[in-house]
Amino acid sequence: MAAPLRALAVAGGGESSESEDDGWEIGYLDRTAQKLKGPLPVEERQETFKKALTTGNISLVEELLDSGISVNTSFQYGWTSLMYAASVSNVQLVRVLLDRGANASFDKDKQTVLITACSARGSEEKILKCVELLLSRNADPNVACRRLMTPIMYAARDGHPQVVALLVAHGAEVNTQDENGYTALTWAARQGHKNVVLKLLELGANKMIQTKDGKTPSEIAKRNKHLEIFSLLSLTLNSLEGKFHQLTKEESICKLLRTDSDKEKDHLFSSYTAFGDLELFLHGLGLEHMTDLLKEREITLRHLLTMRKDELAKNGITSRDQQKIMAALKELEVEEIKFGELPEVAKLEISGDEFLNFLLKLNKQCGHLIAAVQNIITELPVNSHKIVLEWASPRNFTSVCEELVSNVEDLSEEVCKLKDLIQKLQNERENDPTHIPLMEEVSTWNSRILKRTAITVCGFGFLLFICKLTFQRK
């Protein structure tokens, strides 16, 4: 038995249809094959055609087309069968209709089939396949709707980086603006789609284009509380912009879309690798060429943020790149933990001041770490649906936290050993008859004797003064 599937088909970008009572029964998907029992009148055939489209009954659609129904038939509010199929991301139906001669460039009041496909409420994989089919039939990626929004803006707004890349590879303009002055980059920043922002920057998006109210994409991101994207757009250098903009269509498709050879042939462009934290940091500084080097040396972002300049040089990072990294660390106020260099344990002349300084620094840094974790706990949202930015799998965070707990336990154990060792040394030193106290110790002892003597004398003097007053009153 086929399960019901609820879905609404609306015009892209929130544009409503001209007629609310259009006769479409959208939302029930029944893949049970149905066949015509005989010739039907024209009106009844059109009604059956609509039901076949809404239920996704491809065999019935083909049979009706064979019976003489035009593939470009317009229904009550002006949509064609191809437009509806694109609105629900039905790849097989789109392919059948195109093969039967459906017009991929059709539009209703400037609402094109391609815009409808890019604004569909399906998975990115299905949307990508529908868009690829339409582009292969010469659909224009730069035709805008009544709000002057182009297909790439809808794809960016809905968070589809692969669709954005495919549209640009077929000639879509990256920096066009809609009626409010929004570009595709502005839409991605507004909605908090980090991967789309990165992809658009690579494709030549201009982050300085302002909306009609004078806001840049970074300001739009900040206003909508997408602080990670705000920082990314603020730090991103011009070397990242337009990285692939001058490539040919074939080169763009090859570089921007990664396919999975283990899947079926019709599952084109089904795999996309998102940027990790390290890649995001490097891309933001225009140092994406360092990605392979750091990964080869197994240097994580956490490790990179704590490396000193000499360590950067040892790992093959040039002086110019070192300056960019150090400047970014300073701008981000990343405090480098400096514990100082302890003398070798083998030496007997261990400086007490230096050792005490190390312990004080260690204690201070532990306090900073505790405060940082407490701050993170208070800032994290309680419910998962409140998380706006794209996160990796929670298992990754859990595993790191487990490792942190283990490291903290190891640290506690080692500090206890250090404490016991120091206590043992102190006891042996106090019980050693041959021990000669240092000058500081002698001086301290003498000062203590003098203080006690002075206090004693003052006490006797005060007592005599009280006794004298008492005697005089009597």
Swiss-Prot record:
Pfam families named in the record: Ank_2 (PF12796), Ank_4 (PF13637), SAM_2 (PF07647)
GO CC aspect terms: pi-body
BP term (GO), one: male meiotic nuclear division
Phosphoserine found at: S16, S17, S19
Keywords: ANK repeat, Cytoplasm, Developmental protein, Differentiation, Meiosis, Phosphoprotein, Repeat, RNA-mediated gene silencing, Spermatogenesis
Domain SAM: from-to ranges: 271-333
Repeat in keyword set: yes
Domain of life: Eukaryota
Subunit structure: Interacts with DDX4, PIWIL1, RANBP9 and TDRD1.
Function: Plays a central role during spermatogenesis by repressing transposable elements and preventing their mobilization, which is essential for the germline integrity. Acts via the piRNA metabolic process, which mediates the repression of transposable elements during meiosis by forming complexes composed of piRNAs and Piwi proteins and governs the methylation and subsequent repression of transposons. Its association with pi-bodies suggests a participation in the primary piRNAs metabolic process.
Name this protein carries in UniProt: Ankyrin repeat, SAM and basic leucine zipper domain-containing protein 1
